[in-house]
Amino acid sequence: MSGLLAALWLVGLFAAAPALRTSKNYGVADRLRDGLILGVAIPFVLGFVHLLYPAACWAALFLLAVLGYLRDAPRVPVRNGERPRYLLAGALIAVAWPQLMRPLLDGDSLSYHLPNAAAWVQAHSLWMTATHYWWYPPASELFAAGLYAVASPYALPWCGLGALALMGFRIASWSRTRLGAPPLLADALAAATITAFPLAIQGATLQNDVWLAAFWLETLYWLSCEPSNAAIVRCAALTALLKPQGFLLSAIALGTFKARPRVWLAASLALALWIAHDALLWHGGGAAIFSGAGYWESTIVAHGLPAIGEFLRVTLFASPFALLAFLAAFFGPLIERKSRALGWAAGCAALAFFVLPFGYATAVAQLATGASLRFAAPAMAVGAVLLARPARRVSGIATALLVASTLFGIGVIFQIFWNDGSTHVALPIALVAAGVAAAAHRWRAHWLVPIAGAAAIVLATHLAARHPLDYYTDSLRVGNTAPGIYRWIATQRPRAVGGWGVRLGVINVLSPATHTVDLPDSASCAYA
């Protein structure tokens, strides 16, 4: 039942997306963007007024779906739909399915992304300080909160896939319609981007680097192609609420393109609203902000050329295409001659990666392990777009290399999850996804895609819920000994649990009704 509710919610957001429609042509990327924005806006508004209840979420979605239908119905399609992105559709499922069919396993997702979302749902409000990171810019976690409120924690991996799909379809659309890339080249470019390891590994997590990259790319797209479109306002505002550096990237985009004052106002108001929220709660809530080296020491640039060399080595090993896309962004002002603003925005994003905190190390090595490559996601995304024009000159060779890169990226993900036999079905399911896209286009059966998507959500949620205890217990196993704490929580379902040095997200998955609280570092037992 929970899988069905998750499918209804996610497909419902897709159906309600035209409520935000602002252009005559409304492709897959546009619908994905607006669906994700609605998925953030519903819990954001309800949570601000202490109404974050399942019934309120469903009522809001129903009203928006009706509005979307009324706005969309009178419009006559200007063409027979978009050409299916066969490579992109298959690649998305190939890298995401091994993660979708499992409960959340990513460390950051379980440490603070999910605990934030769960705490809001449990409090029915955004006005809480039960977690260390309650102050964190909330956009992607709000999307997770909506799904957590109405459905199942085992459906949460789909939150990451939506952002990854938006990035892929926007790169394909931008390359094809605006930059003149041949259809297969545009498809292959998008597929190679979303299968690059730093991005693909977030395809079914609650991490927000791909979210930031996707919405920053959307902001750049509309600033570059239709600077008066109202979609810019929403994209810039949402970007400002993604990670602490979201507003910096928004400012880079708006500054390089000399955006209109209303766009600046929207991004500033969104951030100001959340800062006001934090200011009002700051006195009563502890906050975990940073641990490890100082700000400057945590950056890559502080460690000079050896650190930059390490970045090049680690990125090349993880994904050659990711390195190529990043370098394209870094040299954007030289590569992009027709839209100088786009080139400078890309270059600034690449430079920001080297000077932002956590790029080199925190309490643990970030760069040497490749963990910090995810912070370069915005630069990689726009760098992929910048590669479209040069790739046109050698279209056949470029397409072949991009397909090879796509297969390499899929192989990296498969290698990570291969020991679990269920991973082996990911490739056949990816082929089915491409087949569904082809059938829907050939027979003009547009209803086929949401039905297939709903079926996939139900199936993946069921598979993820089969034996979560095995995954989580193994994470604490020492030799042949495994503690029984997670099994006790799953069976006893206590009313509340205070945690210190533990990933509260595991408890949020195993016992959604259990209220979880991050205990302070000092006097934890007394506080509990």
Q: Can you say where each PLM-predicted feature lies in the sequence?
A:
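Hydrophobic, aromatic-rich transmembrane alpha-helices
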Residues: 13-19, 164-175, 313-351, 383-390, ...
